[in-house]
A protein has these predicted regions:
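Short hydrophobic segments within beta-strands
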Residues: 18-20, 106, 175
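Hydrophobic residues in alpha-helical segments
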Residues: 50-51, 79, 166
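C-terminal cap/substrate-recognition subdomain and adjoining C-terminal extension
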Residues: 88-102, 109-247
């Protein structure tokens, strides 16, 4: 689904920015950082089963965090000490706030570690669409609130969140890096991709812009807000948003 409606005063769709978290908004894969520090020694075997397609991301995540040797506060403190947001995330959020543009983190990861990094950076107001967790009696329970009806067993869907913004009349800019971002990349109006998502887009002939940090998205959203058109959807290496530009 691509946005076709218009709901802004200018008569064009209002922009919205959605970004993956692990390896995209965050420099690191924060989930794996926590598993390396606090997880069961066999967690990488479970990850390989996921990579080989034997289990889905929801199953992989619940299995590996089931035996984590730390409580919520300990893991959040570790995230605040060791994780970092990618450059220009804060600037993009500031621009979006100043111009009434929705911006949110969309993740199949766990809410408690995402909120920890955002809190440390003073960005606790950034909306987060992730797996909601509850810590009780040494166990974690998981709640999947962002999924298509009947597909709850597959976990959260980033494509579902993209569509929910488009149904509100938004022109969606999306950034991601991995397998869980593929559905969103197909549905977003403009996609910024790196790592395995970029390869997937190449293989599937899905137009995208190369992603290194949030500079390019900031420029693209600012241009759309000013002139009423998004960037031309190009192949890597030719993107007008990939090089140096004055902010």
């Amino acid at each position: 689904m691509k946005t076709t409606g218009a709901n802004s005063a200018s008569g064009r769709p209002h922009p919205a920015v959605l970004t993956d978290f692990d390896d995209t908004a965050a420099v690191q894969n924060v989930a794996e950082m926590l598993l390396n520090r606090f997880g069961d020694p066999g967690w990488k075997d479970v990850r390989q089963r996921f990579r080989d397609g034997h289990i889905n991301l929801k199953e992989y995540q619940e299995i590996t965090f089931r035996n984590i040797r730390a409580d919520r506060a300990t893991m959040q403190a570790y995230v605040k000490e060791h994780a970092n947001l990618r450059p220009f995330f804060r600037e993009l959020w500031g621009f979006c706030q100043a111009n009434d543009i929705p911006m949110a983190v969309v993740s199949q990861g766990l809410d408690f570690y995402i909120s920890a990094l955002l809190d440390r950076e003073g960005l606790s107001r950034v909306p987060v669409y992730a797996v909601n967790t509850e810590f009780r009696h040494g166990e974690i329970s998981y709640h999947y609130n962002h999924t298509y009806p009947g597909k709850e067993s597959q976990g959260n869907s980033k494509g579902f969140v993209v569509e929910s913004f488009q149904e509100r009349g938004c022109y969606v800019f999306f950034a991601g890096d991995g397998h869980s971002d593929q559905e969103a990349a197909r549905k977003a109006d403009v996609t910024f991709a790196h790592r395995t998502l970029a390869k997937f887009c190449d293989d599937e002939s899905i137009p995208y812009h190369p992603f290194e940090d949030f500079r390019g998205i900031l420029l693209a959203v600012r241009e759309y807000s000013k002139n009423g058109h998004g960037p031309i959807r190009e192949r890597p290496g030719s993107s007008q948003w990939g090089g140096e530009a004055e902010l």
